[in-house]
C-alpha cells in the first residue's frame, strides 16, 4: 500500500506491507501479523517487533483453559492467514480485514472461517480484532476473506465465499466473490448473497475455474473499474502442475448494481436531498430498449411545477452520464431546498446518480 495522501507518518516511506508469517519467539514459532516498509517497492525493511498481532489456526479442539492459554493469542477470535489491508480515509487510519475462525455448535475451535477487523494509526499498534462478518443462514459455506475499498462515501467488500461445510467437510471447494456494502466499514449489508459479483464455473481446468483471491485495490479509470485477482482451478489444485495466474475483470464505471423494473415499467422515489447548490444532475443508465424520465417532488412528496414527468426530456440509449433535462427549465430555476427525485423507468436500468455544481 502507498503512503496515504497528506499523511505525516514515516515521511521517507512510500509503501507499506502487512503479511502473515511465523516468527521465532523464545524458541517457538509464533504466527501472526508482520509489517514491512519500503521507499521503492523493491527494498523492504521488516519492523523489528513481530508478530504485532498473534494469530491462530489448528485442529478442532475445545478452547484451552484460561490458565493454559499463555501461548495463545490474548483474545479470541484472532487473525489468521488471510490479511487484506486498506487505508480508511474517513477514519484516517489503516484497517486490516482478516480471516478468523469461529467455533462449532459443540464448542470446538476452527470450525468455519469468518472476518475480523483491526485498525491502526501508525501501522504498528493495532486494535483488538473485532468480529464483523460471519456465515449466516444464507451461506452454504464459509467466508474466507474480505477485500474492502472505499468509494463514493461507502465501503464495498468482495467476500471470498468458500464452498466448504464446517471443518472443511463437504462442498466443492469453489471460491467466488460476493459484493457487500457498509456505511461505516463495520456493519455490513449482504444484499447479493444469491448472485456472485465475481463468479466461477467450477468446471474445466482454466486457471480461474474454481478459486478467486480478490484485492482491496481496484483501479478506477474514467470509464471503468478494473479488478485484478489471483486464481487457480480449485481448492485442491496441484499448484506445481496446474495452471494458476492473475486475472482481470472489468466493470463500467459505477455499475455495481442496478435498479430495473420487474415487469417493464416502474418508478423509484428517492429520499429528500438538498438541491440548492446543485446545477447539474447526471444519470448512469442503460435505456437502450426504453427510456428514463425524472421529475422532482417537494420533501413532502408533491410534484414541482415545471419539473414533472411530462416536462422531463426522456433519457434514451446507454451512457455513464446522461444529463437530466426538463423542457424550459434548468436546475438554476429551482428554489433552494430539499427535494425528492422520482425516477420513471420504462425497460431501462439505473446504476448511479451524480450531483454536480
Roles of regions detected by a PLM:
Residues 1-4, 8-15:
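Short, small-residue-biased leader/transition segments that mark boundaries at the very start
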